[in-house]
Amino acid sequence: ARVPAALSRPSLALSILGMPGLTAWAGMVQQAKVREGDVVVIPAAVGGVGAMAAQLCKRAGAKTIAITSGSEKRRIATEVLGYDHCIDRIDEDLAEALAKIAPDGVSVYFDLVGDPTLTTVAQQLSIGGRVVLCGLIKDYNGDHKTTGPHPGLWITKRATVTGLVVYDYESQRSAFEEEFVPIAEAGELVANEDIHDGLAAAPDAFCDLMRGRNHGKAVVRVGD
């Protein structure tokens, strides 16, 4: 990754100011146009994309709901990244939890995982809700592929559903960096990184990532 000249912490060019950050900005700012009063649900909530997405939404005045699993990830979501609420996808019933936290429905869903989470959250959308389809983590390690909600659900919800490929926003990277590098340098953005030391640690870091064991953006540190 190219490291912006004004950046004092190079690893940020791999996380909140790199492709994950650009992806979050493209999805939440450019496509969903998150605004004050929105209720935004983000799965894979403490990963590189989710962490930046949450902070962008909070800066816009939205209410943020994390979906993750495990006590440590729940702690990071609320105490480090500032999510308003966190739902444990393993220990809680997602539909019931969403109905309780967001009784008027979900305004924006940033889909990073695919089904069954996609369908469950879609059923909780408010009328006119926005969905940004960006990732399919659930499809990475299995033969079953995400099918998603029936099209009739999108119609009933009057939903706006867009697909996000971050490379379409590469031409806007400079504008993104110009805005957010100073904000990061001022300490106003949190970079949640899961750092592994040494190139020999790379295989384990990758396996942890694929198994959902990482607690942030996976970074392998090979030198100073």
Report the location of each language-model feature.
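C-terminal capping/lid region of NAD(P)-dependent oxidoreductase domains
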Residues: E188-I195, P203-D224
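Short amphipathic alpha-helix with an adjacent loop that forms part of the alpha/beta core around
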Residues: D93-D104
